[in-house]
Amino acid sequence: MKESTVIHFPFSVRRGVWLSKYSTFRIGGPANYFKEVHSTSEAQRVIQFLYSHNYPFIIVGKGSNCLFDDQGFDGFVLYNSIQGKEFLSDTTIKAYSGMSFSFLGKTLASSGYSGLEFAVGIPGSVGGAIFMNAGTGKQDTASVVESVEVINSKGEILSYRNEELEFGYRKSRFQNHNEFILSATFRISKNSSSLQIAKDLLESRLLSQPYQQPSVGCIFRNPPGNCAGKLIDEAGLKGVSLGGAQISLKHANFIVNTGRATSHEVKELIRMVQDKLRSQGISLEEEIRIIPYRLP
């Protein structure tokens, strides 16, 4: 189906919603159609309809890893607000995908549960953490995931075990399969030191990352055996600006929005960094999702 086709949805939708409001970068034009879902049944209905009508769509959680286009998105944006968690046992907890990953980690650590302390300070959703296999230099989401529930194109709920999720460094099967991540079950354990561990990790992040400015976290994946931020800094690019976009002075693998940055400016900075490092024989792969105005 072409994006310009007039379509009548059997559920309420919003039009012209500015995606800058749903991105931690504060960048992005209006979505053609926008729908926020709050329940499993609602998500099933929307997903099934979109697939059956072959309508282009993207799924968004907290928007903490997305660079939206200045023109917006000529398709359907499905915004995931499915919240909630439940203990399945003393060693497992199920969390729904729209929940804040950082809040989940903080809640568990405050209750004396270990396993997700590293999540504190990661600004995305549970679903986003699964999608990107979010983590730190020492631990990632894959290390504590037991299983993940998804909604497929028919609106059915399926479950994948950890070994079926194709986890890799900042990668998962969901980057190649457009399934709706519904929930994840995590392995946890009791630990009286968990809250202090979480506090220490958060303090370290606050000291080293530009949390006070709009960004979408690390722009590039670290090359094997090296750190992208260190390489960018050594290339003399820290602090370089283009319009309202700037390579962070605090952490060179972050690009921050200093006021009125556009997606074009951010993408040009990304190209500048890649070209500079490529001239030194180093290839940098983007970690963020760059969402085009139209899907290919």
From Swiss-Prot:
Q: What is its EC number?
A: 1.3.1.98
Q: Which residues form the active site?
A: 170, 218 (proton donor), 287
Q: Where in the cell is it found?
A: Cytoplasm
Recorded GO MF terms: FAD binding; UDP-N-acetylmuramate dehydrogenase activity
List, in alphabetical order, the GO biological process terms annotated in this UniProt record.
cell division; cell wall organization; peptidoglycan biosynthetic process; regulation of cell shape
Domain FAD-binding PCMH-type: from-to ranges: 26-191
Identify the metabolic or biological route this protein is part of. Answer: Cell wall biogenesis; peptidoglycan biosynthesis
**Gene3D superfamilies linked:** 3.30.465.10, UDP-N-acetylenolpyruvoylglucosamine reductase, C-terminal domain (3.90.78.10), Uridine Diphospho-n-acetylenolpyruvylglucosamine Reductase, domain 2 (3.30.43.10)
The catalytic activity, as recorded, is: UDP-N-acetyl-alpha-D-muramate + NADP(+) = UDP-N-acetyl-3-O-(1-carboxyvinyl)-alpha-D-glucosamine + NADPH + H(+)
Family membership: Belongs to the MurB family.
What function does the entry list?
A: Cell wall formation.
- The protein's name: UDP-N-acetylenolpyruvoylglucosamine reductase
